[in-house]
Amino acid sequence: MTKTVQKSKARDMTQGSIWKQLLLFSLPLMAGNLFQQLYNTDDSIVVGNFVGKEALAAVGSVGPIINSLIGFFMGLSTGAGVIISQYYGAKADEKVSRTVSTTLVMTFILSIVFTILGILITPYMLRMMSTPNDVIRESATYLKIYFGGVAGLMFYNMGSGVLRAVGDSRHPLYFLIFSAVVNTVLDLLFVVSFGMGIEGVALATVIAQYLSAVLTLYVLTTTDGPYRICWKKLCMDWSLLYRIVCVGLPAAIQQMVTSVSNVFVQSYINVFGSDVMAGWSAYMKIDQFMMLPMMSVGLASTTFTGQNVGASYIDRAKKGATTAFLLAELVTIVMMIPLLIFAPQMVYLFNQEAAVIRYGTLFLYLLSPFYILCCVNQVYSNVLRGAGDTRTPMIVMLGSFVVFRQIYLFVMSHIFDSIIPIALGYPAGWLVCSVLIYACYRKFRWNKGMRKN
């Protein structure tokens, strides 16, 4: 039974129609990422409507902190996924198995480190972000509970990354749907029925994340594929760990430092008070949904490129990059239309106060047209990662999202006493990053990358 299920889920992306392979692989990723976002979005909707705007601002303001720490681990997981996809494309089953084992041990160790570190640095990070006094206590409460259960998030993302690397994007989707439903039910139960406030939404998120982790690990344990987890044979292959770190560390540094830079962006937002913070929080939740199509296609292009590079199908990998970009642009444009039409109504879902709706709508109208720039960055940076080059995206993104954006924000904050120039810091960084990453993709030497990997 397990064998039949596993064969129907894994996908060999070295054969068949390119656009169909990318589309069929991307759709479950889009749906899965959608339900992933429902975790924090449910939290925001519930606290915004049943607790208050301060609680909504608290949930929104801690996002960059969570992403900065989790982003480091996710970067290392990217390294593991690239290596697994290349070995899978090359039909090197023993290497696939040992890479999965090494990744699991690495995840266990890092989950302990991140749990302790996250709880310890919470108050310092919140003060560094200039979090207002009417928000800081609830922000700290939410963060500490979240980090107490961060292992569930890590093991789910590790497991789903392994499944994506071999072409299975459906199992992670099924588990996310289940856990998102559980999260929603528990949010309402803990907050509305039990009156637990922000502690309730944080606890609901942690429970749901652990459920998705358990289900993912179960699939990896029971499959008959080369990526099966054999608990009695778990070991750390130091040579493979070195490869994972070499490929994943640049992505890890990039994601973590970029997220840290977003902490500083949040600090500029916080200066304008809780109304602007709540409006920005609502915008950021909607922004995460808008990013889903391009992020999903980008992830698909990583797996597609990795498998085809592993099989030495370079021309097919290049065609896949162009197809993925066009697909991401098309879906993003289609999603932008209803967003611009119903912007006030979308913000209303998070909070009904007039000032919050006004600021949230302003951010949506101001920034949404620039989403078409992000498709360039999301697709071509992931293509380079799939080919084994994670350093170039790291350098480009750090230069664009950290150095350039922080200089821009510093200058604008001293010239203008307005939130609009601050908000435009995001698309300004997108533009610089997209131009640079596409130029690097055009100059990428595929044959050299193959020999290196």
Predicted regions: what they are:
Residues M1-S26, I84-A151, S193-L249, T305-F370, ...:
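Short alpha-helical transmembrane segments in multi-pass integral membrane proteins
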Residues S77, Y146-R164, P172-A180, V201-T216, ...:
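Short runs within selected transmembrane alpha-helices of multi-pass transporters and secretion channels
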Residues Q15, W19-L38, D42, I65-F72, ...:
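Residue-level signal for short hydrophobic patches within transmembrane helices
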